[in-house]
UniProtKB/Swiss-Prot annotation:
One of its GO terms (molecular function) is tRNA binding. CTP binds at G32, R35, R116, D159, R162, R165, R168. Its EC number is 2.7.7.72. This is CCA-adding enzyme. Homodimer. Its cofactor is Mg(2+). It comes from Levilactobacillus brevis (strain ATCC 367 / BCRC 12310 / CIP 105137 / JCM 1170 / LMG 11437 / NCIMB 947 / NCTC 947). A single active site specifically recognizes both ATP and CTP and is responsible for their addition. Keywords: ATP-binding, Magnesium, Metal-binding, Nucleotide-binding, Nucleotidyltransferase, RNA repair, RNA-binding, Transferase, tRNA processing. The gene is cca.
């Protein structure tokens, strides 16, 4: 196969390949950018594989950065955008089920491609658009299926994260995992325990925000991988229910987390524990506590003016999206109108400050904050106008 019209990202990177080839080495575009171009999807960056060793690459270009020199990766900066260029390599055993114990640089493209995870990712492309397909990846793209390169048992024993990548790709691409690969995932599922949670988290979120999350979640359940995701063990029924309800991907990572925590029926403290086990940031935990609480309210009815104010517009939309997936009526227009009609949308918009109240005779201290909080509530709920004289009078009279 030869692609006639290459995306701009490839065109801009052509001089890099040409420079390497003119020096007598091989160089190809590889990986997801090749796959996605064939599928007609947008690409964002390109990766280059070459027979040139890192030191040889550094002699060919004026500006380079060692981004992963021990694995043969050098960033080339000569042509504006940085291009990651990695030497063809073969890999030894993987005693930690994630990273090879030893990397050996080789001159063979075939040796390099056979160590990759799936056939659809083991495609290479020359700078003129000619696709090199040594493992029938083009056929698997045509049939919309995910197949491990070579022996799937070996691929997943080498790197257990590949199993999560498989279910992620099933969702992102709306592809089916072939039976032999799926069976190997089932027999190796327990190895997911060996993988850092942060790595698993990335794949889970990509699954939940993909175009076909039902496919990815079904594979997660079928293979047993779900059991080795933090705090999923007691929620098989909840996951099965969510799988049946989630017809399209979550719009954001926060929505994805909200779907899980709401489906699992988690309250504030349990959400903290759950998300800490998933190694999420404190800011994410706070946001998900709010969106989950509001999604639970929306599943039971509407939100009060005060709840709308507390949540904020962006988080309201996340809570509504999650609630709709789980069976609630879509209240997005109603919620936006409620938000826009609030007397104030932030505490800073309150017509009085602590200084104003102290000048009116209120003593400083904890009670001052409590008074301001009460005034904020009264204004938001329409019991007091957001006018300085009225608010001062409400405190001093």
């Amino acid at each position: 196969m030869q692609l006639e019209h290459l995306p701009e990202e490839f065109e801009m990177a052509r001089p890099v390949l040409q420079t390497i080839e003119q020096a007598g080495y091989e160089a190809y575009f590889v990986g997801g950018s090749v796959r996605d171009t064939i599928l007609g999807k947008e690409i964002h960056d390109v990766d280059i594989a070459t027979s040139a060793y890192p030191d040889e690459i550094k002699h060919l270009f004026k500006r380079t950065v060692d981004t992963g020199i021990e694995h043969g990766t050098v960033m080339i900066l000569d042509h504006g955008t940085g291009y990651e260029t990695t030497t063809f390599r073969s890999e030894s055993t993987y005693t930690d089920f994630r990273r090879p114990d030893q990397v050996t640089f080789v001159r063979s493209l075939a040796e390099d491609l056979k160590r990759r995870d799936f056939t659809i990712n083991a495609l290479a492309m020359k700078e003129d658009g000619t696709v090199i397909d040594l493992f029938d990846g083009l056929a698997d793209l045509k049939h919309r299926q995910i197949r491990a390169v070579g022996d799937p048992q070996e691929r997943f024993h080498e790197d257990a994260l590949r199993m999560m990548r498989a279910v992620r790709f099933a969702s992102q691409l709306n592809f089916t995992i072939v039976p032999e690969t799926l069976a190997a995932m089932t027999s190796h599922a327990e190895l997911l325990r060996k993988i850092a949670v942060e790595r698993t988290q990335v794949e889970l979120l990509k699954l939940l925000t993909g175009q076909a999350p039902q496919q990815g979640l079904t594979d997660l359940l079928t293979t047993g991988l779900w059991q080795y995701c933090p705090d999923f063990a007691d929620h098989k029924v909840d996951l099965e229910r969510l799988t049946a309800q989630l017809h399209q991907g979550a719009s954001t990572d926060l929505t994805a987390w909200t779907l899980l925590t709401t489906s699992f029926g988690l309250e504030t403290n349990a959400i903290t524990t759950f998300l800490k086990h998933w190694k999420t940031a404190n800011q994410t935990i706070s946001a998900v506590q709010m969106t989950t609480k509001m999604a639970q309210h929306l599943l039971q009815g509407s939100l009060s003016t005060w709840q709308v104010y507390q949540c904020g517009e962006d988080q309201l939309m996340i809570a509504n999206e999650a609630a709709v997936v789980l069976g609630a009526t879509d209240r997005s227009r109603e919620l936006v109108a409620q938000w826009q009609n609030l007397p104030i949308q932030t505490k800073k918009a309150l017509a009085v400050t602590g200084r104003d109240l102290m000048q009116a005779g209120v003593q400083p201290g904890p009670q001052l904050g409590a008074i301001l909080g009460d005034l904020e509530y009264q204004v938001v709920t329409g019991k007091l106008p957001n006018e300085k004289p009225a608010l001062v009078a409400a405190v001093t009279d």
